[in-house]
Design a protein with these regions (language model features):
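Terminal, charged accessory segments of proteins
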Residues: 1-265, 281-299, 303, 456-457, ...
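Active-site beta-strand-loop-beta-strand hairpin of nuclease catalytic cores
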Residues: 43-50, 347-361
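A short, highly charged nucleic-acid-interacting micro-segment common to nuclease
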Residues: 274-279, 302-321
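Short, contiguous acidic/charged loop-to-helix segments that flank catalytic cores in large enzymes
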Residues: 309-313, 333-337, 365-379
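Feature representing long, continuous alpha-helical segments
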Residues: 320, 324, 379-386
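A short acidic/basic microdomain associated with nuclease active sites
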Residues: 323-346, 396-398
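A structural signal for short secondary-structure junctions
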Residues: 337-341, 353-356, 376-379, 411-417, ...
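Nucleic-acid nuclease catalytic cores
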Residues: 343, 374, 388-438
Length: 573
């Protein structure tokens, strides 16, 4: 197996001898090539699978050494640096997993990479299912293996995944067959024992030193199970798939499975026992095994064309993954803005200032580990928030405001705080797992966007947050969609908590309870506190006030206001 990484520049001969099609890389110089696609490719000329993995695994290392000959760990402005797998291995040194000197073979994280390769393949399949034909996917096969037979147009990986899925879903079937077929086989056949074995006579009674069991004819159920588990063991040894055939049957060695493939004996043997199976499960297993041997024999004989499931612009697939995780299809029409731009992720959740709902606006980012989000991306994200606010206000002006999200309070002329964020995939090389989202704030956050200082409730005062999320979790969740609704709720809650924390870092907030009717109090103070106060609801008995952290006199100014009954300094929750 060969493993390459997207967006990394390799020496061109390495790419060429791997059998990768020219469609999947670009030559920047005469002897260099950069991979521009992600996914799976089978190269018939080398009879091996090639996976191109996302650039998200690459981190910066220095290529300069200190006086003792060790690499300088931290890349700096004065030393040359390169992208490396886990920030440790140069990609051109670990691409060939058949090389016994490959340092990845001794790294415990290799199994995670191999598992991730299969998730990656399935994620592209899933994207294809959800979005139909798309120009970003290069796919020579259009049907997905589902256990049908030789007429299934499927890649070698499709067939292998179907075998692994069958193993996972039919454990009880194999145990049941083993018990049924074993019952009665060890009972003594006394007729055969008496006629075939010479007894020892002692005290006039015969004693038999050995016995004859009941006849056991060839059991085809067990034969196909032995072949199935032997193929799984072959896949484990040859392609490093994580599968442990835990059976009591003697298995066919992997070298003999390879010999069956090379000689064409696998399909011949399966054809000879085809009509011995009647249950749906064993018929399906026969079809899967036949598809496996037929494909493997074609490859061994050099009759297999190259096959690929590769995607350009994997960031589009990642965006779809995040939208499955946190998005809401109910608001897809709002995502498409009048200026032609499309918001990545849009959903509603509890407002930061009230029990009502507010739009959460997200943008997913797919970068290498050390690359920062800056420039145009930040500007566009602030623009998305402004557009959503305006679209919602336009809806209210056109129709009855009842039921619409309450962005603007007519009386204070203040605007609710708009949650706005980036969410970026990352891989922690020291904790690689598929089960934890590990959502955390980015190290480098973004300065608030505003027209006036000290006005958190002004329309143009916007806070933008950045979060990292475990890419492996996003990948596996996208493929499996296990516990989708609960995972979505938990993750949205974590995003909201992180945004609230960020807003609290910028502003001090107060709840002010007037001693006169709220409406009258607002009218009296509107000019003095425009953009600094906001009524959370038409029937609220208090008013939110907010000030920059640098404004140290706001508590006293509020206490000195006329008609104030109580002032509470609080943080948003």
């Amino acid at each position: 197996m060969k493993i390459f990484f997207e967006d990394y520049t390799y020496h061109l001969p390495i790419i060429q001898k791997s059998g990768l099609s020219q469609y999947f890389y670009i030559s920047e110089k005469y002897d260099e090539a950069k991979l521009i696609s992600v996914g799976y490719f089978y190269a018939p000329e080398i009879q091996d699978a090639v996976f191109v993995l996302p650039k998200i695994f690459l981190g910066l290392i220095s290529t300069q050494k200190d006086k003792d000959g060790n690499y300088i760990e931290e890349p700096g402005p004065d030393n040359v640096h390169s992208w490396a797998v886990f920030g440790k291995y140069l990609p051109e040194g670990v691409y060939d997993l058949n090389d016994p000197k490959n340092p990845l073979l001794a790294d415990s994280r290799l199994q995670t990479i191999l598992q991730m390769s299969i998730w990656l393949y399935q994620s592209i399949r899933k994207f294809e299912q959800r979005n139909g034909k798309t120009e970003i996917i290069s796919n020579q096969v259009n049907k997905i293996a589902k256990g049908v037979g030789r007429d299934c147009s499927a890649t070698f990986i499709d067939i292998i995944l179907s075998l692994l899925r069958f193993h996972k879903e039919h454990q009880n079937l194999f145990t049941y067959i083993s018990i049924i077929n074993s019952s009665g086989n060890n009972k003594i056949h006394w007729g055969k024992t008496i006629s075939k074995v010479q007894p020892v006579i002692q005290d006039g009674a015969p004693f038999y030193a050995e016995f004859r069991n009941k006849n056991k004819i060839v059991n085809f159920d067990e034969e196909i199970i032995v072949l199935f588990y032997s193929v799984l063991e072959y896949l484990r040894q040859t392609y490093r798939f994580s599968v442990n055939p835990n059976v009591n049957y003697p298995l066919i060695p992997a070298r003999k499975i390879q010999a069956m493939i090379d000689s064409g004996k696998g399909t011949r043997r399966l054809r000879s026992i085809r009509k011995k199976y009647f249950t749906d499960e064993l018929v399906a297993l026969w079809k899967l095994l036949y598809a496996f041997f037929e494909k493997a024999e074609r490859i061994a004989a050099g009759r297999q064309r190259e096959e690929a499931l590769m995607v350009r612009n994997y960031n589009i697939v990642f965006e779809d993954m995040i939208d499955v995780l946190i998005g809401d299809v109910e608001y897809d029409t709002y995502r498409k803005l009048p200026d032609g731009k499309i918001i990545d992720h849009l959903y509603t959740d509890k407002s930061l200032t009230s029990e009502g709902q507010i739009y959460f606006i997200g943008d997913s980012k797919y970068y290498k580990r050390e690359e920062d989000i800056e420039g145009t991306s930040v500007f566009k994200q602030y623009t998305y928030a402004k557009n959503i606010i305006q679209l919602n206000i336009d809806e209210i002006l056109k129709r009855d405001p009842a039921g619409h999200i309450r962005y603007r309070d007519e009386l204070t002329e203040g605007y609710d705080i708009t949650p706005n964020f980036f969410i970026r995939g990352y891989v922690n090389p020291d904790n690689m797992n598929f089960t934890e989202p590990a959502l955390r704030p980015m190290k480098n956050q973004f300065a608030p966007n505003r027209h006036f200082i000290n006005r958190p409730f002004d329309r143009d005062s916007l806070v933008l947050c950045g979060f990292n999320i475990n890419f492996l979790y996003v990948l596996s969740h996208y493929v499996l969609e296990s516990g989708a609704s609960s995972a979505k709720s938990i993750l949205r809650g974590q995003l909201r908590k992180g945004i609230v924390g960020r807003v609290n870092e910028y502003y001090n907030f107060y709840k002010v309870y007037p001693s006169i009717p709220v409406e009258l109090f607002i009218i009296k103070n509107r000019d003095a506190f425009r953009g600094q106060f906001f009524r959370p609801g038409d029937k609220a008995d208090f008013i939110w006030f907010g000030f920059d952290k640098t404004d140290l006199n706001n508590t006293d100014s509020l206490l000195n206001l006329e008609d104030v009954q109580k002032v509470e300094k609080v943080s948003l929750q």
